[in-house]
Regions:
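A late-sequence structural motif
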Residues: 141-185
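Secondary-structure junction motif
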Residues: 79-100, 165-167, 179-185
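Residues embedded in well-ordered beta-strands
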Residues: 36, 56-58, 64, 82, ...
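Flexible hinge/capping segments at coil-to-helix
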Residues: 45-55, 59-81, 166
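Central regulatory/effector-binding core of bacterial HTH transcription factors
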Residues: 1-43, 109
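Short beta-strand->loop
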Residues: 46-56, 126, 130-131, 138-152
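Hydrophobic hinge/microswitch elements
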Residues: 20-24, 29, 87-140
Length: 188
């Protein structure tokens, strides 16, 4: 979609920034970003819901929990847990708080790819948004959580946006009915 937009508007420059939903929302509130593709956060911005995304358990191949149809949330209290973005307001932390779960954290990292590598190596289990998991689907087992946990994923943007941002917003909203379910790679 970015290349299609720039074909129509070659004079508009774009900068793509990666970060957690909370980091990107903070950039939006500080006017350091015009748009954020994030899980839902409160704040002084507009919001367009794109999808309700399931959270999934990440398991190493051959792990006993891979025999189940879903991973019970309380399994994270006893299994070796790999925490991504420790101490930050991320979806995993929100899910554990919502479920009153204290995970058995044995490893932590500030890099989601390191989380997947550690899971693949059998060091523990983790959770992530399903939309982020497609790049690893052949190397890590993804199972639903029990009870089911989801996060709203959408486009956040400022209340007062520039004409260039307005053009991008119209372009995106015109495309929304045609957006495939797996389009975005969201860190969180």
């Amino acid at each position: 979609m970015t290349s299609d937009f720039h074909s129509l508007h070659p004079g508009i420059q774009s900068r793509i920034v990666n970060g957690t939903s909370s980091e990107l929302q903070q950039m939006l509130s500080l006017h350091q970003a015009d748009f954020c593709l994030i899980s839902e956060r409160s704040g002084d911005h507009n919001w367009i819901l794109l999808r309700n995304d399931p959270m999934v358990a990440l398991l190493p191949p051959g792990h006993p929990l891979t025999q189940k149809s879903a991973v019970p949330m309380n399994a994270f209290e006893t299994e070796s847990y790999i925490q991504t973005y420790p101490g930050q307001d991320v979806d995993n932390a929100r899910i554990f708080s919502r479920c009153h779960i204290t995970p058995n954290t044995q490893f932590s990292t500030m890099d989601i790819n390191a989380t997947y590598s550690m899971v693949e190596a059998g060091l523990g289990i983790s959770i992530n948004n399903l939309v982020n998991s497609y790049l690893w689907q052949d190397r890590v087992v993804h199972l639903p959580l029990e009870p089911n946990q989801t996060m709203n994923i959408g486009l956040a943007y400022g209340k007062n946006i520039s004409p260039a941002s307005e053009a991008f917003l119209h372009f995106i909203t015109d495309k929304l009915p045609k957006v495939p379910k797996v389009l975005f790679y969201i860190h969180d």
